Amino acid sequence: AVAGVVNGVLKKDYEGLEINAGYGGTTGPSYDETTASILWGSQSEKSSATVIIDYFNNSTLGADEMGRFGTANQSPYGGMDFRSSRGYPGYFYVDGVKTIDPDCPEDSATASGSCLFDYGPFGLTIPASERVGFIGQFDYKIGDETTAFMEVAMQHNTSEAGGAATPLDEDAGLTVPGTHPDNPFGQDIEIGRYRPVDAGARRWDIESDTLRLVAGLRGTFNDYD
């Protein structure tokens, strides 16, 4: 649906011009919204036209700005620790023995040898988005009991989605060759559950376009509506 247009549609016989704009934001956390709309209508004895243009834009509100709500580890607040075992720097296998990476932070290391990863701060609480909509309604009376009409509606939306770096399991086949200068073991090392944080967080661009066109005749013919 075209954002904010419902009330405008009810003003089908509107005469005149109406312009609205709005802005709101906060600095803690950082977030803002911008809205704008134009409503124009014209009427005559035989015809009418109504045009509505609607705009909405909001910035991203990242989970990293949400304090305790932006972490997967809720244990300090009486909840559960939902951090992922697909960690960074993770763990690896040496001669078949599971070995946690020595750079794993102490509070992320588990007794089973995994290195937990807090994916919470990488989420988007509110993703950035932009919406532009248009509705046009046109009527023309072609007879005493017959009216031609046309309705046009268009909508263009953009947004994004995202999350932490891709979680990889042991079957991803990641290895460090024995010839690698940073491999002190002199043999190929199999990497366990891991996240390629260096590659950055996942982000997807979302875009959609919608068009609706309806035209016809409205009236009475031989006692039929």
Language-model-detected regions and their locations in the chain:
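Surface-exposed beta-strand-turn/loop segments characteristic
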Residues: 1-215, 221
